Curated annotation (Swiss-Prot):
InterPro entries xrefs: CbiD (IPR002748), CbiD_sf (IPR036074)
Biochemical pathway: Cofactor biosynthesis; adenosylcobalamin biosynthesis; cob(II)yrinate a,c-diamide from sirohydrochlorin (anaerobic route): step 6/10
One Pfam family it belongs to: CbiD
Protein name (Swiss-Prot/TrEMBL): Cobalt-precorrin-5B C(1)-methyltransferase
Methyltransferase as UniProt keyword: yes
Keyword S-adenosyl-L-methionine in annotation: yes
Enzyme class name: transferase
Gene from which the chain derives: cbiD
Family that this chain belongs to: Belongs to the CbiD family.
Source organism superkingdom: Bacteria
Length: 373
């Protein structure tokens, strides 16, 4: 069980995959014994054994397997710990039924509230449920651990559903990834760490993978909502899945673009994040590295800013200050163009001959001020 007395903000939780595996294991125990337990010990992908509370357990039908039933139902409520996870308190539900026609097999299906994959690029079958590979294996492992006696004679069909999933998915990136109708069943370890960036990083990589299957050969990477809206207006010919909000995770987005064999990468951003990319940062979070104002002063000088302005830019702490000073001199477009060119120069050094690059720059109101390619 999770530690209830952990310091605030540090309490870990469990993934949708771990909770699904626990619910499935409990339901199979119900088929074996005739009664679904109130708690079940579940093996996580990371090797830990964890006890989950089980609700709404029931065994239905007669004339079934060892325990007499033909189907069983169990539900585990997800506890995300202190992580602000939109799937916290989701009801991960497993319905398991006997399949006399498929002895020894474990089949996995998605029910209501589990998304359906509609686009390639995710490593999942198009038309199938959005249950990722690690949770799939973990669910099957837990089913086999307690149901081997049944599996000697019959197969087991496990359907995972999430009653609130259709509503919860509106707060995720699933629609952009072509996962429709519900949430994804996720988790590589089974554990959710508070405020971890792992899930977002994974969604960035998946987004780029999907963009690589669209046939356009291009992905448009943005640093946030405003920049994405801006580049969508600049490139209306591209479908929505070609645009990926990479946030601070340039490294992962670019790595995925290389693996996907994309021919062109477009980056949309504002002066702050673009400066960090230009100076060689591949993770642009505010806490990872300071803005190189010396670089900004150099760029300002290259487009004609007087020495006193360059000194002021160098002595300030923000990229926004540099942009505003250059705008006031009437050199804003030239300055931001020089910055975009430096971004391309830096990325070409890191990713030589990998793809065509283009950078679009917008101001803090989302208006275009420069571009380079």
């Amino acid at each position: 069980m999770m530690k209830k007395d952990a310091p605030r903000g540090t309490r870990t939780g469990f993934t949708t995959g771990a909770c699904s595996a626990a619910a499935a294991r409990a339901a199979v125990i119900g088929l074996v014994t005739g009664q679904v337990p109130d708690a079940v010990e579940c093996l996580l992908p990371n090797g830990d054994l964890v006890t989950f509370a089980v609700q709404d357990g029931r065994v239905e039908g007669v004339g079934g397997g060892v325990g007499g039933g033909v189907s069983a139902h169990a539900m585990v409520i997800k506890d995300a710990g202190d992580d602000p996870d939109c799937t916290d308190k989701a009801h991960l539900t497993a319905d398991v039924r006997l399949r006399h026609d498929l002895p020894g097999q474990v089949l996995l299906a998605g029910g209501f509230g589990v998304g359906t994959v509609t686009m390639p690029g995710l490593g999942l079958a198009v038309g199938g449920p959005a249950i990722n590979p690690v949770p799939r294996r973990n669910i099957e492992a837990n089913v086999r651990a307690v149901g081997q006696g049944l599996l000697d004679e019959v197969g087991l069909e496990v359907t995972i559903s999430v009653p609130q999933g259709e509503e919860m998915t509106k707060k995720t990136l699933n629609a952009r990834l072509g996962i429709l109708g519900g949430i994804s069943i996720l988790g590589t370890t089974g554990i959710v760490k508070p405020y971890s960036t792992a899930a977002y990083r994974a969604s960035v990589v998946q987004g780029v993978q999907v963009a690589g299957t669209l046939g356009h050969g291009v992905v448009v990477l943005t640093t946030g909502g405003r920049t994405e809206k801006f580049v969508m207006e600049e490139m209306p010919e591209l479908p929505e899945p070609a645009f990926v909000q990479m946030g601070d995770f340039l490294r992962y987005a670019m790595g995925a673009a290389v693996k996907a064999g994309l021919k062109k990468v477009v980056i949309g951003g504002m002066v702050g994040k673009l400066t960090k990319i230009a100076q060689g940062e591949t993770i642009t979070h505010a806490g990872r590295a300071e803005v190189d104002t010396g670089l900004l002063a150099e760029l300002a000088a290259s487009v004609g800013a007087p020495p006193d302005v360059c000194d002021a830019i160098r002595g300030n702490e923000t990229a926004r200050y540099a942009g505003e000073r250059m705008d006031a001199l009437g050199l804003g477009q030239a300055f931001h163009t020089a910055l975009a060119q430096r971004v391309i120069q830096t990325l070409r050094t890191r990713y030589p001959d990998q793809f065509e690059l283009k950078v679009l720059v917008c101001d803090f109101d989302g208006r275009k001020i420069a571009e380079a390619s």
